[in-house]
């Protein structure tokens, strides 16, 4: 009798587990079927309105009153809206665009101010990043303008360098031309020297005697001496004339004699 009483709860437990497994298999099959027919039924789904919402509410009440085994095989998935009333609530929540599993339902309403604070901090960080972005853009614009100015300066310097190089080339060409002309003149000079004959030296017999040279030197000396004396006489005559003029302008006690300076 005790064995029968112990076996009955075990059998009941096994029956419960088997029913749960069958329900889970049916739920998974229905979910797969709903996913496969979702694309085909999108065109037939009508927009939600008040009538459809009321109908769904009535169906919900009827489904709650009935047993799962009675209605689960009689429902046509294509006749139901996709997201209005899903059969398996947990799986519909997973398939929705909002992942409700990540929402911490176990936390209270005290966490919402923290979220608002986080949003405020995120907004302030976003504003700071925007301000930094504007600053970086301004700095990049300034650097770009400076780089453009430097590039223009570099181009101008390159132009000057090219001009100087061209001028150096012109000067080198002129220098080569002058050197070539000098070489030609040196060649002509060498040819002229070769073409001319050296003069013959005078012999000792043809040279003048020493007495004649001395006489010529004496004549030259006398000539220069006579010129010197003549100039000296003319100078003394001019001096005497000037003295006479001064004597007539300034009266003195004694008349100056010729060749003597007047006394005041």
UniProtKB/Swiss-Prot annotation:
Changing residue 76 to N: In strain: La116 and NC3. Changing residue 101 to S: In strain: AF1, AF2, AF3, AF5, AF6, AF7, AF8, AF9, AF10, Au3, Au4, Au6, Au7, La3, La10, La14, La15, La27, La28, La31, La36, La37, La46, La54, La58, La60, La62, La106, La116, La118, La120, La125, Ma3, Ma6, Ma11, Ma18, Ma20, Ma21, Ma23, Ma24, Ma31, Ma35, Ma37, Ma43, Ma50, Ma53, Ma56, Ma57, Ma74, Mo40b, Mo52B, NC-001, NC-002, NC-003, NC-009, NFS 5.1, NFS 5.2, NFS 6.1, NFS 6.2, NFS 6.3, NFS 7.8, Ny2, Ny3, Ny5, Ny6, SFS 1.1, SFS 1.2, SFS 1.4, SFS 2.2, SFS 2.3, SFS 2.4, SFS 3.1, SFS 3.2, SFS 3.3, SFS 3.4, TW3, TW4, TW6, TW7, TW10 and TW11. InterPro entries: Male_ac_gland_sc. GO terms for molecular function: identical protein binding. GO terms for cellular component: cytoplasm; extracellular region; extracellular space. GO terms for biological process: mating; positive regulation of octopamine signaling pathway; positive regulation of ovulation; sexual reproduction; sperm competition. Induction: Up-regulated in response to mating. Pfam families: MAGSP (PF03082). The keyword Transferase does not apply. Changing residue 104 to R: In strain: La62. Changing residue 39 to G: In strain: Ny2 and SFS 3.4. Changing residue 79 to N: In strain: Au2, Au3, Au8, La13, La32, La37, NC-004, NC-006, NC-008, Ny4, TW1, TW5 and TW8. Residues 219-264 are annotated as: Necessary and sufficient for homodimerization. Changing residue 65 to G: In strain: AF8, Ma3 and SFS 2.3. Its main location: secreted. Keywords: Behavior, Cytoplasm, Glycoprotein, Secreted, Signal. Changing residue 24 to K: In strain: NC-005, NC-007 and NC-010. Male seminal protein which enhances ovulation in female Drosophila by stimulating the release of oocytes by the ovary following mating. Acts by increasing octopamine (OA) neuronal signaling in the female genital tract leading to the postmating relaxation of the oviduct muscles. This activation of the OA signaling pathway is likely to indirectly contribute to the mating-dependent increase in the number of OA synaptic sites in the female reproductive tract. Homodimer. This is Accessory gland-specific peptide 26Aa. It comes from Drosophila melanogaster.
